[in-house]
Structure formats: C-alpha cells, structure tokens
Amino acid sequence: MAAIPSSGSLVATHDYYRRRLGSTSSNSSCSSTECPGEAIPHPPGLPKADPGHWWASFFFGKSTLPFMATVLESAEHSEPPQASSSMTACGLARDAPRKQPGGQSSTASAGPPS
C-alpha cells in the first residue's frame, strides 16, 4: 500500500506556486503568516479561483468562470439530444432483437436449437 503524504508536503506544494523562487524562506513547512515570501501577482485576464471551492461548480452547477457560464446557459436552452440515423444504421435501434450469448435471438422460442 502506498504511503499517504503528510500535510506538510501539501503546504510545500501550495507555497511553491504562491511564492517566487527567490523567497527569503527555505523552510517549506511553514505557513504563509510565519514566512512572508514575495507573493506572485495574479495575471490579468485570467479568472480568480476560489481556493478550496473551485470544484463545487462542477457538482452544483454554479459557475464563477465566464466560459463555463456560456456553456451551461447554452445547454439549458437547447433541445435534448436524439439518436441520429447513423446510430440506427449501426444496429443500435430499439426495435432490433438482441442476441444472447449462445447466438440465439431473444425473440426465439424456448425450444431446443435446431
């Protein structure tokens, strides 16, 4: 069984992306209040993520990202998908009899195979 990493390694990963490489602190286990590093400014044009809650929009349908709102809004006003003619041509129609593992059709009689 693989070992679960300690919370210290998660803090170190978090701090790596939040601080510049030339930070005065070399201790990766300290928190942001204990080791004030130089914060990386947020790039313009990118949406700001809500730390710890970015995944909630995928489960509850609320989106803070503009491109996700466009996709969700267009999906609400569109009609439900329907089977195309190519699916019917491939033998996936609902009326087609289903084959059982022995090569028999499900609509065949219960008698012995001939």
Curated annotation (Swiss-Prot):
Phosphoserine: residues carrying this PTM: S9
A GO biological-process term: TORC1 signaling
UniProt GO cellular component terms: mitochondrion
Keyword Transferase: no
Entry's transmembrane regions: none
Compositional bias segments (type: Low complexity): 23-33
Coiled coil: none
Annotated region (Disordered), positions in chain: 22-47, 75-114
Biased composition (Polar residues): 102-114
Keywords: Developmental protein, Differentiation, Phosphoprotein
Family assignment from sequence similarity: Belongs to the PPDPF family.
Role played: Probable regulator of exocrine pancreas development.
Name used for this protein in its record: Pancreatic progenitor cell differentiation and proliferation factor
Species of provenance: Homo sapiens
